Amino acid sequence: MDELTPRQSEILAWIRARMAEDSLPPTRAELMRAFDFRSPNAAESHLRVLARKGYILLQSGTARGIRLCASEEETGLPLIGRVAAGQPMLAEEFREGQLPVDPKLFSPGADYLLRVQGMSMRDAGILDGDILAVRHDASLTLQDGQMVVARVNGEVTVKRWKRDGKQVWLLPENPDFSPISVDLQRDSLTIEGVVVGLLRIGGNL
């Protein structure tokens, strides 16, 4: 790979650190703010140089489309600590490690793995302790019935998505649990990803 300038090395080190900390690639806007670039185009220009020199890959059509090249990253997918799949809990995300799972095993490809806690998605075949493969892509248009990882007022839960205008319902797959009602004009809602697969350690995929 071509040698980097000090500035390019600084940007690459920042990208690595962000991905290690958050387990997700940074956005162009985050890069722009971190380095006080005057425009997104300046951030994009630096990213394209890193890509041309073989340090990163750029995926079009997504805000978090930065990927470290194979020689720059660990193999597999990062495993994020337990997430509520029952009543939502205050999520303090942490990285448990890296699992040797090919992202391309799933369609669309997964960005990270997330451990489930609780039985609210039992009837969808998701049990306590299972590991979900999650695609984090802000450009995806959610369809009713899709399974999502949602952060509601700071708390994380795994549920099925249903929307009617400004009203969202996060639906469990277990009659012992109640739907979560979200008013988009009042509540804070962030979609942390769409579930694209299931892993059960010691069992079948």
UniProtKB/Swiss-Prot annotation:
<keyword id="KW-0238">DNA-binding</keyword>
<dbReference type="GO" id="GO:0045892">
    <property type="term" value="P:negative regulation of DNA-templated transcription"/>
</dbReference>
<keyword id="KW-0378">Hydrolase</keyword>
<feature type="DNA-binding region" description="H-T-H motif">
    <location>
        <begin position="28"/>
        <end position="48"/>
    </location>
</feature>
<dbReference type="Pfam" id="PF01726">
    <property type="entry name" value="LexA_DNA_bind"/>
</dbReference>
<dbReference type="InterPro" id="IPR036388">
    <property type="entry name" value="WH-like_DNA-bd_sf"/>
</dbReference>
<keyword id="KW-0678">Repressor</keyword>
<keyword id="KW-0805">Transcription regulation</keyword>
<dbReference type="InterPro" id="IPR006200">
    <property type="entry name" value="LexA"/>
</dbReference>
<feature type="active site" description="For autocatalytic cleavage activity">
    <location>
        <position position="120"/>
    </location>
</feature>
<dbReference type="GO" id="GO:0009432">
    <property type="term" value="P:SOS response"/>
</dbReference>
<dbReference type="InterPro" id="IPR006199">
    <property type="entry name" value="LexA_DNA-bd_dom"/>
</dbReference>
<dbReference type="GO" id="GO:0006508">
    <property type="term" value="P:proteolysis"/>
</dbReference>
<keyword id="KW-0235">DNA replication</keyword>
<keyword id="KW-0742">SOS response</keyword>
<comment type="function">
    <text>Represses a number of genes involved in the response to DNA damage (SOS response), including recA and lexA. In the presence of single-stranded DNA, RecA interacts with LexA causing an autocatalytic cleavage which disrupts the DNA-binding part of LexA, leading to derepression of the SOS regulon and eventually DNA repair.</text>
</comment>
<dbReference type="GO" id="GO:0004252">
    <property type="term" value="F:serine-type endopeptidase activity"/>
</dbReference>
<dbReference type="GO" id="GO:0003677">
    <property type="term" value="F:DNA binding"/>
</dbReference>
<feature type="site" description="Cleavage; by autolysis">
    <location>
        <begin position="85"/>
        <end position="86"/>
    </location>
</feature>
<comment type="similarity">
    <text>Belongs to the peptidase S24 family.</text>
</comment>
<dbReference type="InterPro" id="IPR015927">
    <property type="entry name" value="Peptidase_S24_S26A/B/C"/>
</dbReference>
<dbReference type="Pfam" id="PF00717">
    <property type="entry name" value="Peptidase_S24"/>
</dbReference>
<dbReference type="GO" id="GO:0006260">
    <property type="term" value="P:DNA replication"/>
</dbReference>
<protein>
    <recommendedName>
        <fullName>LexA repressor</fullName>
        <ecNumber>3.4.21.88</ecNumber>
    </recommendedName>
</protein>
<comment type="subunit">
    <text>Homodimer.</text>
</comment>
<dbReference type="InterPro" id="IPR006197">
    <property type="entry name" value="Peptidase_S24_LexA"/>
</dbReference>
<keyword id="KW-0068">Autocatalytic cleavage</keyword>
<keyword id="KW-0804">Transcription</keyword>
<feature type="active site" description="For autocatalytic cleavage activity">
    <location>
        <position position="159"/>
    </location>
</feature>
<dbReference type="GO" id="GO:0006281">
    <property type="term" value="P:DNA repair"/>
</dbReference>
<dbReference type="InterPro" id="IPR036286">
    <property type="entry name" value="LexA/Signal_pep-like_sf"/>
</dbReference>
<dbReference type="InterPro" id="IPR036390">
    <property type="entry name" value="WH_DNA-bd_sf"/>
</dbReference>
<dbReference type="InterPro" id="IPR039418">
    <property type="entry name" value="LexA-like"/>
</dbReference>
<keyword id="KW-0234">DNA repair</keyword>
<dbReference type="InterPro" id="IPR050077">
    <property type="entry name" value="LexA_repressor"/>
</dbReference>
<keyword id="KW-0227">DNA damage</keyword>
